[in-house]
Amino acid sequence: IITIDCGIKANEQIESANEKGIDVIICDHHIPDNSIPKAYSIINPNQKNCNYPFKGLCGCGIGFKLISAIEKKSGGIEEVNQYLDLVAIATIADQMPMINENRAIVKYGLKVLNKNPRPGFHFFIRSINREIVESDISFNIGPRINASGRMKSGMISVELMTETNTNKAYKIAQEIESTNLLRRAKEKEVTEEAIKKTDPLKFTNVVYAADWNKGVLGIAASRLVDKFYKPTIVLTLENKIYTGSARSVANFDIYDAIDSGKKYLDQYGGHKYAAGLSIKQENLQGFIDHFESYVKNAVGNKMFAKTISYDI
């Protein structure tokens, strides 16, 4: 089993795989706990004592490092470059910092995308009569790839990216386009309801409901951050457990804030600006109070203020 963008906290699952004689290789960029899984190999630049110089790769970027190393060992490296478009899209869609290696990944990934776009991607960019740039990924391709996983199944997007027959790829893309329209409607609905639940006197926004679509919680959290500029968590109820997504503001580590309240949580994971978590119903209010107190103390009792950078 090779994991991409997950697995660094899956101690029990990997122990189960070990018992069945299955080797597991973890490719993940999320922050590990003190106890890491006993996997065959862990590739994560954010684990302790890792001397890899760049910590900002996305999960897909780390997977690309693995296949590049395998290809290099077998005597070549050119074969893997055809996948740089996928790595670039993942890097942009996961909002990784556009510095260091990520700049090179995106630069050369966009070259692959412009020179020979996969049939499924071509459906979405066919009306753009110029070179595809980073913003086209952020606002066009990325949200559509995400839509199927949020609303139906991520396998639909896998089929989109691997289908070489243009007609078949276009049919998959049309299905994804319809799913994306549904995603946008649900996102709007949840965001509007979530805004009504916010408290202007608090340093954080933690909002929840029993019937919100799980697939759009991360987007809704981002929308609330844009509007109110506060660390934000949006949750929905599923089998008596609140599950959801967290998003942060610039220069505030929301993972550390969530980690500080782990005694209230069932599960959690993520990184500085985005995280996921689940909480039993009876622990929700305790966590909300703790989270608010932690953030308030961390910022010195002053509300967050958005800064705008510009060239001079």
Language-model-derived ranges and their functions:
Residues 1, 20-21, 38, 71-292, ...:
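Hydrophobic helix-and-loop "lid/oligomerization" segment in the mid-to-C-terminal part
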Residues 3-96, 258:
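Conserved phosphate-handling catalytic cores of large alpha/beta enzymes
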